[in-house]
Amino acid sequence: MPLLDSVPGATFKTRVRDESVPGSNPFRWQERTSDEIFKGRKVVLFALPGAFTPTCSSNHLPRYEELHAELVAHGVDQIICLSVNDAFVMFQWGKHLGAKNIFMLPDGNGDFTRKMGMLVEKSNLGFGLRSWRYSMLVNDGNIEKMFVEPGLSDDADGDPFEVSDADTMLAYIKGVQPKGVSSPRRQFEG
């Protein structure tokens, strides 16, 4: 299982709201580095294969949103959802799911995901390069705990969802045994 001691350096291309931008779409590009995102903070990051996909949309992201307050109450400063998608897709997906408390982090070129050892080929599904599903607790840039779904490989037949879920992460932070993945939080259509 790939495991680093600290998060790798990467630059993320994000879009931020800026009322000084004229027009009906007041957003501008802003680069964010790994250091800006992780240094001096306790962060839960969960990574998934793609926005608008079944498990990601019905359970993975919605459950982290649902448990946001409890994770924060246990010392987490920020929860991040990362996917090898662009900033526009991540914004619209978060908006579609009503994710108000999760930072939607686009890794459009897969640079961070590649350095994490989690970039996989999913051409068998027409996805191209994507992130393998995992979650991690990062404290001041150092990876304290990482939950990687089994079977990490290119063109995997399945999409396991057993350990990177919000309930497992919360159980780890609380120091208790996880009870397993919760049932889907929303219906997936498509």
Indicate residue ranges for each PLM-predicted region.
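Chalcogenol-based redox active-site neighborhoods
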Residues: M1-G190
